[in-house]
Swiss-Prot record:
Gene3D superfamilies: 2.60.120.200, 2.80.10.50. It comes from the Eukaryota. This is Probable alpha-L-arabinofuranosidase B. The gene is abfB. Organized into two domains: an N-terminal catalytic domain and a C-terminal arabinose-binding domain (ABD).
Length: 506
């Protein structure tokens, strides 16, 4: 009989042969199944997680007419057909309405309902994610991830086959390690079926961010931790595990697994390298976590009680039945690396040149002589022409800068107030001085795309990609198509968010 180390080595070899034979033969859920811990939920908007899977990955909904379509892999086991989305959503806004479960259990993720906390949408539901907020490529093929802004969340409170009570499970997610905050809580995993906080140990989910209300790791974060309810844990201590490092890989693999009085945190660069173990040992030294009382719902982007103040980006993830071996997880990581996640352009339409001075003209039929300008800190539209006073020309001129939060997009500095930039604040656009904070940089970063009405450019917020520069009663907002605010009204939306960009007046 083989010893335990020998069995482990044999399993690694077997999985290695699967991985090396072909990418399609080594999809993550095939690997977990070979390891004896099959997927009970498999979610991805970027690719199939089974080699034979050819069903829908996700559904998108158009803002113009409410029509929906499903996006499937290009071929069985392959990358999502982003071109089908681009065609369906051309010159329109689109939201991700369903993230389908590929496991066959029907554990699909949909718009999260209200719970202990209400969401910002109608009837307390959370927002849905933009379909274009997180473009990437996998082996050179374009796909879209799920960009979670604060207030956005997905959930399934009636999941099938997920771990209940103290039963063992594993999970991983591929995330954007540069997109996070300190809000509660950017999670993926097992949560309460009531959307309420029902006590310690009633969750087991991957958390990623810089929240320090409960636990923390080394450095200043962000960290991979486990949300076990009423605590984000980095190890056995409720307070800190110095072995849990700050990690900010552009593509990050985060893994959590837990069983009776044991659990582990693992992480890696999803683009290269191997998983490292940040914690492996007993359950936290606090009441309610041994045994666990997991309930089996599935969440994405939110906490178990619908806490929805966090942000992050999700590309793929699964949940398993049983406690996966390190060898199984290592083989999954090898497959993730082989998928070759890479960044791609966040912008489209007429090109902008960093350092240039521009003016932006409205295209709505009422307002084609009006340009984006400011009066003090208020961003508005004003009638401007070559005959206008120099002061007004300067107020309607903006210097293009590299995006303060993401170099793939842009920030717009006031010509007449150097050091001040357009930002969104409570979804109004305002002119504020750059205070150098992470929050300011994110609020002041915008990504142009081809104009939704066929003219010029539409300029969406990087941090809230459902929201665009919109003039409404001559005042500027970061508006979504048909959202809950007055300035989100669907009427004339595509016209109101389309701007013709020209050389600056000043």
């Amino acid at each position: 009989m083989l010893s335990q180390p020998s069995r482990e080595r044999a399993f690694v070899l077997a999985l290695g042969l699967v991985v090396s034979s072909s990418l399609a033969a080594a999809a993550p859920c095939d690997i977990y199944s070979s390891g004896g811990t099959p997927c009970v939920a498999a979610h991805s908007t970027t690719r199939a997680l089974y080699s034979a899977y050819s069903g829908p990955l996700y559904q998108v909904k158009r803002g113009s007419d409410g029509a929906t379509t499903n996006i499937a892999p290009r071929s069985a086991g392959g990358v999502a057909n982003a071109a089908a989305q681009d065609t369906f959503c051309a010159s329109m806004t689109c939201l991700i309405t369903v993230i389908y479960d590929q496991s066959g259990r029907g554990n699909h993720l949909t718009q999260a309902p209200p719970g202990g906390f209400k969401g910002p949408e109608a009837n307390g539901y959370d927002n849905l994610a933009s379909a274009i907020g997180a473009p990437v490529t996998l082996n050179g093929q374009k796909a879209y991830g799920v960009f979670i802004s604060p207030g956005t969340g997905y959930r399934n409170n009636a999941a099938s086959g997920t771990a209940i009570g103290d039963a063992a499970e594993g999970m991983y997610a591929v995330l954007d390690g540069t997109h996070y905050n300190g809000g509660c809580c950017f999670d993926y995993g097992n949560a309460e079926t009531s959307s309420l906080d029902t006590g310690n140990g009633h969750m087991e989910a991957i958390y990623f961010g810089t929240n320090t209300v409960w636990g923390s790791g080394s450095g200043s974060g962000p960290w991979i931790m486990a949300d076990l309810e009423n605590g984000l844990f980095s190890g056995s201590s409720p307070a800190n595990n110095a072995g849990d490092p700050s990690v900010s890989y552009r593509f990050l693999t985060a893994a959590i697994k837990g069983g009776p009085n044991r659990w582990a945190i693992r992480g890696a660069n999803a683009a290269s390298g191997s998983l490292a173990t940040y914690y492996s040992g007993a359950r936290p030294n606090a009441s309610g976590y041994n045994p666990m009382s997991k309930e089996g719902a599935i969440i994405l982007g939110i906490g178990g009680d619908n806490s929805n103040g966090a942000q992050g980006t999700f590309y793929e993830g699964v949940m398993t039945s049983g406690y996966p071996s390190d060898a199984t997880e290592n083989a999954v990581q090898a497959d993730i690396v082989a998928a070759n996640y890479a960044v791609t352009s966040l912008t489209s339409g007429p090109a902008l040149t960093v350092g240039s001075a521009i003016s932006l003209r409205a295209t709505t039929s009422c307002c084609t002589t009006r340009y984006l300008a400011h009066t003090g800190s208020t961003i508005n539209t004003q009638v401007v022409s070559s005959a206008s006073a120099t002061t007004l020309k300067q107020q309607a001129t903006w210097t293009v800068r590299t995006g303060l939060a993401n170099s793939g997009c842009f920030s717009f500095e006031s010509k007449d107030t150097p050091g001040s930039f357009i930002r969104h604040s409570n979804f109004a656009l305002v002119l504020n001085g750059n205070d150098g904070t992470k929050q300011f940089k994110e609020d002041a970063t915008f990504c142009p795309q081809a104009g939704l009405n066929g003219q010029g450019s539409s300029i969406r917020s990087w941090s809230f990609p459902t929201r665009y520069f919109r003039h409404y009663s001559n005042v500027l907002y970061a508006a979504s198509n048909g959202g809950v605010h007055t300035f989100d009204a669907a009427g004339s939306f595509n016209d109101d968010v389309s701007w013709v960009i020209s050389s600056g007046f000043a």
